Each structure stands twice: as C-alpha cells, then as structure tokens.
Amino acid sequence: MDRVDADAQPDSQPLGDLTVRTIAMPADTNANGDIFGGWVLSQMDQAGGIAGVDRAQGRVVTVALDAMTFIRPVRVGDVLCVYTRVVQVGRTSMKIAVEAWARRFCTQIRERVTAATFTFVAIDEAGRPRPIPPEPEAPVRP
C-alpha cells in the first residue's frame, strides 16, 4: 500500500491531480492569525471526495484518514492547492493520497503544508456500501 508521509521531501513536486484550488481568507484564521488547520483538513476532505466520486462513479463517504502533520502554516492570501491520487482500491473502499500545498501570496513560491491518506467507501442510495466498478477507460473531467 502506498502511504503519504507529510515530512518526506517537503519541497518536492506535488503528486497526483490538482483537484481543489482556493484562497485562504481572513475568516479562516485561528487565534494566532494563521489559517485554521480544520479549514485545511476540510479542503483536503473535499478534494479526496471529488477524486473518490470520480473513481467510484457515484457517492462516497469518508471513513478514516491516517495521521496528519502540519509542517508549515497557511497564511491569509495563500492559494491552497490540493492534489489527489488513488493509491488502493478494494471491493467497496479506496485509499486516496491527498497533499496540500500553499502557493504563497503574490509569489510563485509553493510549499507542501500537509498530507494524509484518506479512506473512502462507495455507498448506494440507501447509504450502504456498494462495490466499486472497474476503473473507467478515461477519467471524466470538466
């Protein structure tokens, strides 16, 4: 199984597809003036969910994530870029590696801020686990 290590090569290139890109706003700050870690986690969960829906061809739910280490703060004005890649697919669940990178305000400097592996389960209309279909021939992206 492929696992994301937030501390490994923090300034290498992102792995996976750019799935979510958003700007960090003043309303998202913690008491120290940095962006609240829960906001970053939420963006990562959304990105993982998008990748999961694409792969499962239907609804998915987050059931777990491995340990996360925030290695750098995100600041107001930074563009948070979240990259995803499916690393394992089981019968009803999948693991998706998710990396969050900050493009620093008004610069082209890009730094990894955290990473984790999320586990998603494909569900049917009743919310029960369902089999994940074979991988489609070509991903559908807008």
Where are these regions (language model features)?
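Small beta-barrel nucleic-acid-binding modules, principally OB-folds
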Residues: Q57-P73
